[in-house]
């Protein structure tokens, strides 16, 4: 076993299946901290469960409101999110910042996300100590669709209790909000049940 410390990384975490899959793709979970931006206790609880299930370094909860649902300002708010997460990653001594967005069905959005990351990287580089090692940005799911992310969840035996895809609070996902509808469709196509198990053959 190597004595080399695990590389530290910060994952922007909204509690979604995308964040869960991105976490599972990491090779050294003990070096991973979740930057929990999930609004509501259900998403935050999913993040805490993931820390316990996967042996992660910890979770940081942020309270800053982000207007990501408003199309008029979503791009600006995404940039603000990345800048705040980048500052947090540098403060924690992380080498990488992981942004688990899946935009594979929207080429324009993919390009905008990549441009946004480059702009934030440049700004962080300009505004941090010159002796600080540049922060690396990682978008491991960028060119995937939600259905492909769901397929990955199956391949990785993802524990569904480590994610929360509903826009509302409750004992379980409501099944009716836009987020639930999108993820239910993707998960059903991938045969990934809400309990986190594969559907039986022929079911």
Where are these regions (language model features)?
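Short cysteine/histidine-rich metal-coordination sites, predominantly Zn2+-binding motifs
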Residues: 169-170, 191-203
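General N-terminal targeting signals
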Residues: 26-28, 154, 183, 191, ...
């Amino acid at each position: 076993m190597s004595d080399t410390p695990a590389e530290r990384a910060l994952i922007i975490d909204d509690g979604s299946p995308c964040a869960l899959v991105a976490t599972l793709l990491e090779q050294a979970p003990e070096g991973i901290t979740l930057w929990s931006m999930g609004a509501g206790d259900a998403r935050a609880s999913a993040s805490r469960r993931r820390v316990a299930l996967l042996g992660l370094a910890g979770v940081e909860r942020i309270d800053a409101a982000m207007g990501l649902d408003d199309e008029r300002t979503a791009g600006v708010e995404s940039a603000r999110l990345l800048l705040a997460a980048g500052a947090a990653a540098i403060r924690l001594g992380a080498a990488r910042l992981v942004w688990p967005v899946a935009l594979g069905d929207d080429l324009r959005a993919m390009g905008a996300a990549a441009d946004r990351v480059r702009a934030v990287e440049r700004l962080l580089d300009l505004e941090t100590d010159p002796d600080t090692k540049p922060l690396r940005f990682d978008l491991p799911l960028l060119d995937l669709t939600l259905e492909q992310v769901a397929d990955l969840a199956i391949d990785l035996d993802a524990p569904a209790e480590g994610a929360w895809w509903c826009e509302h609070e409750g004992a379980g996902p409501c099944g009716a909000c836009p987020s639930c509808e999108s993820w239910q469709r993707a998960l059903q196509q991938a045969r990934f049940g809400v309990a986190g198990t594969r559907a039986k053959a022929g079911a």
